[in-house]
Structures are given as structure tokens and as C-alpha cells.
Amino acid sequence: MRIRPGTRRTAGSVAGLALAGLLAATAVGTAPAAAAPTGNGAGGSHRVEYFPQPGGAGRTVEVPADAPARTGRSSGASLSAAESAVDGTVGEQAVTGSTDDRLDVVIIGDGYTADQQDDFHADATAKWADITALEPYRSYQNLFNVWTVDAVSNESGISGDPGADVVKDTALSSYFWCADTERLVCTDIDKVASYAAEAPAADLVVVIANSTKYGGAGYSGLQAEGYPFNGVSTLSSDHSSSSLIAAHEIGHSVGLLEDEYTYPSYGTWTGGETDGPNSTTYTPAQLIEKRAKWYRWLGQSDPTGSTVGTYEGSAYYPYGIYRPTSTSIMRELSSTDFNLPGREAMIAGFYRAGNALSTSLDTNTAVKYGKRITVSLAVGTTGLARTDLRWYVDGVEKVHARGRTAVTPGSLGVRADGRSHKVTAEAVDRTDAIRDPAVRALATDRLTWSVRATGHRK
């Protein structure tokens, strides 16, 4: 399911490239001048996010669209026939339904040789398990398909590990020390797109770099740049904190959440209300008066340990704009929780991209009185989710059929009266994690069949 295109609009976006100067003063490490990456000449750039240290707040910076020429696969070191046979192989790590009904994640490894692809698959499984251990990913993981694509590198590991002068010949040209910043792992997005295209569908891409060193990055809003997927996260394979980078970045791509951290030099936000569901210029009284943003959650105890309110500082600006809680995973990675408004926004994003209710029976073809109608539910009643399945005939609920995943029109009371009838299956997620009626509508799926009630039971 293609994620609805959208560009993250944050209060901080108006600052543009002025952020680069700030980053120079705040970055954890700075590469030697001689080791600074040099683009391969194609031009263009991406704005990416990275986290200078485990558990810390993020930073954003403009980086070249193309990886440095020195980090790419050498033209003189092509793959052997056996390696080429492995390169681009697609695996089904966790496929739960049709690509039309799911949010499709593609995981690609970089810095894994042909003999290390089993290691890549183990790392992909482990990293996705880390992400889906967090709510609301845990409760809604069956709305995702997860595919792997094998990318064979000529050398093990990636450039910049352990030092800025280390150069590796890898499939995706991933490298530490991007933009002279040690923990920032950039990759060649065009190469990523080429490998991701091997999978049946790709809404989001995760690039796992074969490294024990902490690092990663997040590219979002890529559909607006013409890519088929909306976000790419990079992360190192063998650092325990790197998975949180992807969990945060998916918050942007799927939940449309803004960053909640700030830059002291940005001062006071003087613009109008922002689009993000987790930033506002309104006070609690104004939120209630305007029935805006997270007013339904005000005063509630939050998974982050805070109470939902308005806490000054968000979307890069320390003053004049507010976030829902004192901390969350969108503010710093020392928190592994989305706050309640953020959690609701994530669930909305899951349902924008995926369908909880599906069937193999064509809804465009009329069914007969005795035809068995079977549906599947991707989301049940575990964790946060509370999916309620009901059946209707001509708009009237058949209470006795609640929860059934297989019925016949006859069992629902359709009579063989020669008239046409409508049978509808409706799945509604009645989770307490949703309070906004608009999000509840997204969490509602319906399938309808016409019934030819002609007296024939087959």
C-alpha cells in the first residue's frame, strides 16, 4: 500500500540551510579535512536526521544525494556469477497479507558479502523485533509486510568504520562520517531504490549497515522527490541502541510526527499553527476552545511518565511552540515511548496505509445465498488493539454473527426472495488509544457483497 505522499512541515523548516552552521558546533565528531566526502558529481541533496549519541536528541543536516565516489562499489571489482545470483534475492521475513492491504517495509543490508547474507537475515530479524517490541508497533505489526533484499558487497563492513579514513567497497555505498559527522550514516538513495524495487512493494526502507559502531540516519518525504517509498532509515547492525533510530524515523514517515527537540539558537517561533499532530502554538485552554490537536488527551497520564499538557519547546524552537509531554521518542531516544497523541497519530498512519479487514472473495461479483464468505483480520484484540467485527444485511446488524470470520448470506438471515441484498462486514478498532473520531474512521474497514437471493443455495 503506497503511503499517502506528504511533506513534513515543521516550524524548524523555515530555517533552511542555516542549520548547517549550528551542526558544525554541536556535532560529536569532526572528520579530518582530508577525509571529507566528495560527491560523485550527480548533484542534489537530502535533508537527513541523525542522533549524535545513544539516548540523545536528534540533529538535522543537508547531505549530498549521492555517496562519495570513493565509497561505492568499484567498477573493477564486479561480482562473480555466484555472487550475482544471490544479489537482489527477495525474502519474506514477515508477510501478513496482500501488498494492497499492508504497509510494506523493505530491509536491505550493506557491507555484507555473499557469505554473510545469513548474518544479514539474522540482523534484519533482530532489528525488526526491536522495533515491534515498542508500542504501538507491537499491537499493529500485522498491518506490516516485511521483505528483505540481499545486497552483496565486495567487502565486509562500511566506510568510516572504525575511522574516517577507512574505505569499503559496498553495494549501497553507506558510510559513517557523512557531512563530517561521525555517527551520521548516509547511503546512496538511488542504489537503495534499485534494490528496493526487487521487492513486491516498498513503502518504507530500512538499510542495515554491517557494523558494531553506533550510528544511523533518517531520510523522510522522499515520495515528494519522486521515489516510490516515503522514508529510508539507516542503522548499524550490532549496536543495541540503533533500532530506536528507525522507530523514531517511522514516526515521521507514517505518523507524520514532528521532532520535539529544540535548538537553543532558534529562539522563539513566531509563525502560525503547525500541521504536525504533536506540536502546537495553543495553550491548553485554546486547545479545548478550538477542539484542536490533542485536547482530548489533556490531563491524562502518559506512557512516557508525564502528564499530557503543553510543554514549551518543539519542532526545533525552544519558545513559542509546545509539545504534548516532557519527553517522548520524538524528543530523545532515552525515551522508548510515543506519547498518547503521538501513539494515536501512529495508529492513524498504520490505518492510512493498511487495511485490517481483507478477503479473497471478489466484492465486485454477486454471491449466491449459500456462498461462504470468509474474511481475515490483521489486527485482533491483543495489546492496544480492540478490533470488533460485525455483519450487516441491508444496513441492519446481525448481532448473532459478531466476531465470526466466516458466514453465508443464509446464516445471516437473507431470504431467497428473489431480491438483491447487500451483506457487509465491518471491522472497527475500538482501542482506547484512539479518541479522535477522524482516526476512528481510518480504523474502520468495510467489505460489501451483493447477494443474488434467487432460491438457489450454491
Regions found by a protein language model. Give the residues of each.
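Short, flexible loop/turn segments at beta-strand junctions in immunoglobulin-like
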Residues: 411-416
